[in-house]
Amino acid sequence: MYCIEEKIEKALGIKEASLVLKNCNIVNVFSSEIIRGDLAIDGDTIIGIGKYKGKTEIDLSNKYVAPGFIDSHVHIESSMVSPKEFARAVISRGTTTIIVDPHEIANVCGMDGIKYMMEETKNMPLDVFFMLSSCVPATSFETSGAVLKAEDLKELIDSDRVLGLGEMMNYPGVLSREEEVLNKLKLAGSYNKIVDGHAPSVRGNELNAYNLAGIKTDHECSSIEEMNEKIRNGMYIAIREGSAAKNLDILIKGVNAKNERRIMFCADDRHPDDILKSGHMDNCVRRAIYNGIENTAAIRMASINAAECYKLERVGAIAPSYKADLVVLEDLKDVKVNMVIKSGEVVFKDNKHLKDMGSKSDITKVSNTVNIKKVSEENLELKLDTDVCSIISVALNSISTKNVKRKVNLSNGIFKCELNYGINKVAVIERHKKSGSIGIGLVENFGLKRGAIASTVAHDSHNIIVLGNNDEDMVKAVNEIERVGGGITISLDGKIIETLELEIAGLMSNKSMEFVAERVSKMINICHNTLGVNKDIQPFMTLAFLALPVIPEIRITDKGVFDVVNFKFL
């Protein structure tokens, strides 16, 4: 129980604090100073900086102590591991708070998916807050596993762990005043909750209208000019450094003393190998400092700025009364984590976790999510009225695409992969309602010359997507995905040669992040070296985004090939 009298006595040095970090270099995010001294902690609260004695004392030998890092916007599902395993990985990188949008699992499992994520993240040495997914489904051009309306979200909106409404991707719906979109915005407003934005290239009067609807943040800026305009409008900007979308090196050049307090960091979508190799928020801080940002400012963007944006009281700074969420760093250049303290407890030290992540939650309601009609080679037959057709041309080292016209070779009006070198067939198979809906299209530049690959990670509705150079291997891959209940797989010469099961909603594995990263890396190597995939293509990431019908120019869903520019099926 909090006793103010006793805390004051300990702050005065009359009584010993429970924990004192001795000989620290303390990063003060308020004054931009590095302060030498002892840091006194009692329970979960910082009680003072100065000269203190404690029941437990740790000599830090001039190491740096910073506020624990905050990820202001993340989709855990993109790590392909369970929330507990994700927590284990990012705690070791100095992260003590994350703000999660469970958008991916919500598109598969609806409210059951959100509830699973909330249950799974209880009682961990990591604070996990939620933004309720605002766009389920993301569009009407694909079949999702759920539809969430304002009435559905009302069940959880007043939870202490729910900070507001997740990224409002449907900015056209905001501007056109769609009833259901406005209902969700009104719901968040009625509970005084925050609304996250998703508004790439939205500027001028449209941005004014978007902000007027109550939207406070954005993580989609691609230029300094766009970032500054949104800051002028009162928005907080989360600079994103994900696996596919990386904006830090561009945007950080526009950060200065005038705008820095409105800027945060976020991972958004970050894959397991990137977290293990490069890090999490520590990577953002490190890259910011490398790009010339003053070290206390970089740490401020990874801590107090996000805390203030999301109304997290007593979080994000090292000062009396603030929560003792701390990261001990070897230096302020490499930002190497030595120790992590969460709520006054040492939870990670010398590359070892000192507190477990708790027992795993029941996955019954978020497993066995592949529900399809039997798929045969006949189902994947592509009949064309003409030998000139639209093809999805994938870009190298990017998730962007071009809509190109190509002449193809047909056999009795049917596309045959063996007659069209350099062009792969792609199909999206609805996996939620057993509708039998299948969209089929063609892809160039992917480079796959043998076999097929398939996945249940296919943004945003996460149907099965399969790409190959022959129908037999494509069907084999789809059947394997159904057999394991979701995941990613490779087939070749009529045989399955590698599979990673993603038993949680077809999106996440219960295995360790190290296991998942190693398996994904192995499968990528097989794609490049055995199947012939272009080495400038990340096969499974590129495959996953081929199904997202909101990114220009051309995509594929279970309903067909979609022209994003002209907003129509081809």
Swiss-Prot record:
GO biological process: adenine catabolic process
NCBIfam families reported for this sequence: ade
Membrane-crossing segments per the record: none
Pfam families documented for this protein: Adenine_deam_C, Amidohydro_1
Name used for this protein in its record: Adenine deaminase
Molecular functions per Gene Ontology: adenine deaminase activity
Matching PANTHER family: ADENINE DEAMINASE, N-ACETYLGLUCOSAMINE-6-PHOSPHATE DEACETYLASE
Native organism taxonomy: Bacteria, Bacillati, Bacillota, Clostridia, Eubacteriales
Family of this protein: Belongs to the metallo-dependent hydrolases superfamily. Adenine deaminase family.
Record InterPro entries: Adenine_deam, Adenine_deam_C, Amidohydro-rel, Metal-dep_hydrolase_composite, Metal_Hydrolase
Cofactor(s) needed for function: Mn(2+)
Reaction(s) the record says it catalyses: adenine + H2O + H(+) = hypoxanthine + NH4(+)
Main EC class the enzyme belongs to: hydrolase
Keyword Chloroplast appears in the UniProt entry: no
Keywords, in A-Z order: Hydrolase, Manganese
EC number(s) stated in the UniProt entry for this protein: 3.5.4.2
Chain's gene name: ade
